Amino acid sequence: MTRVRALCVVLAGGRGSRLGPLTTGRAKPSLPVGGNYRLVDIALSNATHSALTDVWVLQQYEPHLLGEHLAGGRPWDLDRTRGGFRILAPFQGPEHDGFASGNADALVRNWPVIDSFDPDVLLVCSADHLLTLDFRDVIAAHLDAAADATVVSTVMPAGTDVSRYLVVQADGGRVRSVDYKPESPTGRCVGTEVFAYRPAALAEQLRDLHRDGGLGDYGERLLPRLVAGGAVADFRHDGHWRDLGTPTAYLDGQLELLRERSPFRLDDPAWPILTSMPVRGPAIVRRTASLDRAALAPAADVAGEVVNSIVGPGVVIERGAQVRHSVLMDDVVVRAGASVARSVIAEGSVIGRRAMLGAPNAVHPVLVGSHRRVAADAILPAGSELEPRRPRDLIRGTR
């Protein structure tokens, strides 16, 4: 049997501006998820378990934290002598200035190096979703369909606002039309931002669009042109898929992991999520602690009450403090008597004594950026956002 030469490109350069202070100073794929992991781990673990040996990560916005986490691909067994892991960093050249304006633009900027790899199939996926998917199934279906492109789609639950997605109309295994972020969606089937391409067909469309002066995101012009050619296949994903691109989705998507029958497992023995994580000591639960549906990462120290929440590495929750329906990132401190509800607190922040954040039944969570100090007795109502301390403030030691 002829071996298929497949290349997986993980798009990890997104800013994630809808997440407000949580992505100030870092790319969205570097955000923590489930306490121990980062969003990019999901895509890389899918690639590793799918036996894809050549995986490239395309970076752009704030790449430093993400680059450190990627550790040369070692946590995903991609640090190979031949092939394996590669980071595609942003660059300027004779044909391109500034940064890429979208996913399709990012592909055309990096096309020379992709083309030199000469893949039979180019699999492109985003790095900011919860998804378990064997990419080998996608590649096999793509080749069987002799398609120029294959869109991995899923049907969203009734009542979901799909206006921020690529809405897909398909039948008989073929995509008939796509509508990118429509104001009035006509269905609930959306693209999961996983695609397989025939490289020659993709290159032709990218060249034409680049010559015409506009690429942007894949759904704006690239996919509509491919669909118009009639050779785009639909691969229906029936499992769990969760976009974590808004504050509410980022919080609720993680709290779903705490259910007894969670729709997504980070610790599935057959498909574990792999990550790069420094060695830290075990979590400590003090005598005064009360826990109900709590995920505790290493080195957490809990003496207060935790309900339906994810507690990141090194987090300290003092006696008398309450944390409910929230996500606390690395090394957050919640002082005695403080109450945190429906909130996402970024790493290194300190919640002062008797401070009150959020409300248990609020739709919009409180967002606190990294290394902030919330004063004692402060009140932050639902939907409040605090930007991180700026780097120069950290250097000066100001508050």
Task: Locate each region found by the language model.
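Unchanged
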Residues: 1-257, 364, 382, 387-388, ...
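Left-handed beta-helix
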Residues: 1-7, 200, 204-399
